[in-house]
Amino acid sequence: MTPPSQAPPADLVKAVRAANAAGDGEEAAALVDEARADNGPTPTVLVAQSWVGRGALAAGDLDKAEAVGHQTYAEAQALLRTRGLDDDAELPLALGASIELLANVAVARGARSEALAYLQRELDTWADTSMAMRLQKNINLLSLTGTPTPPLATEEPLGEPLPTLAALRGRVVLLFFWAHWCSDCKRQGPVLEALVDRYGADGLTVIAPTRRYGYVAGGQDAAPADEARYIEEVWREAYAGLAGTPVALDEANHARYGVSTTPTLVLVDREGIVRLYHPGQMTEEALAPLVEQALAQGPPPTK
C-alpha cells in the first residue's frame, strides 16, 4: 500500500486503470484527454496519464509508453516552476511514475544497465524528497536479488532485542517491512505466522522493520515517543501470532530497501544473499517454495 497522504486521485485514476484492465487503451487516453481539456495538466491529470503509459507498456506498445513517460515528466517539471515537489501530494506521484515508466521501457528494450543508470541519476536528483524511496525501490527491483543484503539498522528495537543480519548468518531471514496504518500488512501477518510455524525449526527467522510516519490513528500528529508506543500497540494487537519477532524501528531501513510500498518482503539466504525482493503482498503458496529452496542450500561452512 501507499501511505494515505500519497494515495492517487481516486475517480480519474480508477477509471483509467479500469480501461487498462479491459484492454481499452484508447478509452484510457480519452479519459485523460477529457480531464486535461477541462482542467489542464494538473497533478491529478498527470498521475492518470502515467497510467495510460503503463497500459501501453503492458500492451507492448513501447513507443507510446515512452512518449507518455517523456510527456508526463516534462509537464511535471513545468509544474515544479510554480510550486515545490511536495506541496501537492499528487505531483511526486506523477513525476515518480514517469521516471518508473521510462526505466521500465528501457528494460523492455533490453537496456537494463541504462535503466539502472537513469534511475540512479534521478535518485541523486531527488534524494531529499518523498520520491527517494520509490526510486530506490525501482533500483532494487532491477539489481538487489543475488547481491549481499544491505545493512539493517538495529539500534532502536521495539520490544525484543534485534540481532544483526551478520549474527543471523546460517539462517534464512525474511524481512517484513510494514507500516502501522497498512491493512495489506495486517493481511500478510497470518501468512508469515504460518511460514514460521512450518519452517522456524528448520532455520527461518522473520524480522519486521518499520518506521515512524509522524501520526497515529485517525491521522493525528504524534511525537516520536508517542508514535513508537502506538506502533508497539498495533504490533501487539494486529500481529499477535508473530509475538517474539524482532521489530526494527528506523526510517533508514525503509530508505535503504526502497520501501515505498508496504508490505515489502525480502528473503535472505543462509549466506546473506538476497533471493527475493518483492514490494506488495505474497501468498503462502508463493512464498513457501522460495523459503524451502533457501533452506535446502544448507548452512554455510564454519571457518
Each predicted region: which residue ranges?
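Short active-site neighborhood of thiol/selenol oxidoreductases, capturing the structured segment around
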Residues: 161-186, 192, 206
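Thiol/disulfide oxidoreductase modules built on the thioredoxin-like
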Residues: 238-244, 248-292
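N-proximal helix/coil linker or "cap" segments that precede and/or mark the start of modular domains
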Residues: 108-155, 166-169, 300-303
